[in-house]
Amino acid sequence: MCIRDRMSEVTIYEVGPRDGLQNEKIPIETNDKIQFIDFLSDTGLMFIESGAFVSPKWVPAMADSNTVLSKIVRKNDIMYPVLTPNLKGLEDAIKYNSDTACVFATPSESFSKKNTNCTVKEALHRAKEVTEEAIIKGLKVRGYISTVMFCPYENEIEPIKVAKLAEELIKMGCYEISLGDTIGSGTPIKTKEMIRDCKEAVGVEKLAVHFHDTYGQALANILASLDMGIKVIDTSVGGLGGCPYAPGAKGNVATEDVLFMLNGMGITTGVDIEKICKASEYVFEKLGRVPSSRVFNALQSKRKRNI
């Protein structure tokens, strides 16, 4: 039985405004970021990760998250998650009416120390503190696991380590776990092996996937994930993003590219690819460069030929 015979709908979880923009050395203007999110709110997306309440010293591009969350035009049926790595971040998220807090962990001790300056155990303790308090305050909590297949410092990661971490995050109260191929070196077989173990630990309905396209494997890995029953995919308009603590990591898989593939498979997302392209065009114009999305560039070229 082919994938489209078993699956008719997939949820796109847009991470461009946070994971996509967080590494920009010259951040775009706050008003431009607000407009970008407002454009995304008009595309049919149900989840738009919109900011991060983190130290401006370490992530200056997210220093305006309070203003952004205050001024975006929210729609009742859309969630606007924010990254909250500690209780201070959660306090700010609550202050600015965030609906979803995001916590993160990694099975790699080396990556954990580089990324958050703490051990895996300490990171889990922080995540537990944030998750429990967020739930008390009425927020939903999403968990991220980085380096789920390969680590830039420890090489290959055992799937069972990822599964155990996912189980810990679900136990503490996360409603969903996003499995991140941080350096983009995962392949379809590795993807299936990792998801298999995580499915056994927490159930496939609790899992999402988050791929970077460093080695051009993202769409193939998404296809493999769909075959394993995954129904939530993290994407970033135009391929925005990377990871400052993962040398060589390129952008997230482009929203446009994923939508084009899913549309061609007859899988519904509810997201308008043309409106996504307009949002992508807007933010990349502000950044002064061209989107890496192949679909965006192909559609732009097609439009120019038809003028």
Positions of PLM-derived features:
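Catalytic cores and adjacent flexible loops of soluble metabolic enzymes
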Residues: R4-I307
